[in-house]
């Protein structure tokens, strides 16, 4: 219930804007996906960084919410490192099952960057034995704000901006709003099946 209070008004215009139920573009899940990660909402594990609260709504092509879908989220920490790959642990990784509204919420950190990519989040949704993967991106004006703050500012701005990233798609850009010391965002994932 608290999730709806936090995101209800923010997500409502987004849901209306996707009334056609056009499938969300699929993107490669990437080389750093791990299956053995904790089921949890808070992915931060005490790491420094700008908080990011994310609500995802998963639905089918007929705009019906998908309950019980496994949603995995993973991304780099503030220094651009993936857990389980560049550093030990499971920070910035986790999964949840969607509720009766097709929703999951995560509390994580704004990701850092690494040289070949613009900042992004990885998502993998599994339902009924079928898998969908995509990535979400961040507005560059928000990147400028975040990367001017510690611990990000030591590394400066990403070397690759959204337009230079070959996987970037404007329709996968997160809408973000300020929330306390961080941001909140919401996204509707319409699966192609």
Task: Report the location of each language-model feature.
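N-terminal secretory signal peptides and thylakoid transit peptides that target proteins
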Residues: 1-13
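Beta-strand-dominated extracellular/periplasmic modules and repeats
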Residues: 19-169, 182, 186-193
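Short, exposed beta-strand-loop hairpins at the edges of beta-sheets
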Residues: 176-178
